[in-house]
Amino acid sequence: FSLEQYVGKKYVVMFFYPMDFTFVCPTELHAFQQKLQEFERRNVAVVGCSVDSQFSHFAWLNQDKNKGGIHGVTYPLVSDFSKTISENFGVLAADYITNESGELISRGNPVAYRGLFLIDKEGLIRHYVINDLPLGRNVDEALRMVDALQHFEEYGEVCPANWSKGKDAMKATNAGVSNYLSHH
């Protein structure tokens, strides 16, 4: 798997989750699946990633939803068994110790925090959020951030707090913010 396949073609929402066969994770994966067409209409590829093996992903994909599985999920799930991707994105939840050589060594079995990265068509991270392990994310918020980025790219207007598609945005100037605030 490589994010390079999307550069110049699609936006990407890449999200990390701790582990297959757990508790909050299947609710998130199903929530992304339920909104997948909305992401696709916005030219966004959705990609999930955990530190599990591809074999674990396959088994979980074949387990029925009513048994905690993710049967029916159709977007790619990346296996980060080496934990390199999670480490590179800064989402690896690990305790580290320093060995005699001064190297950081992780203890236990690190997993990924619930990181979400919105990557533009040029391959730049434009938004990210990292939730602690017990805190599920809001897929509608991910869609809202896609809308905000695409609005900015199309119109050059910045999107204020709580902005949603179809609402007023503003020019990134003193006059723009003054005008916006005087009407809101």
Functional labels for PLM-detected ranges:
Residues 1-184:
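Chalcogenol-based redox active-site neighborhoods
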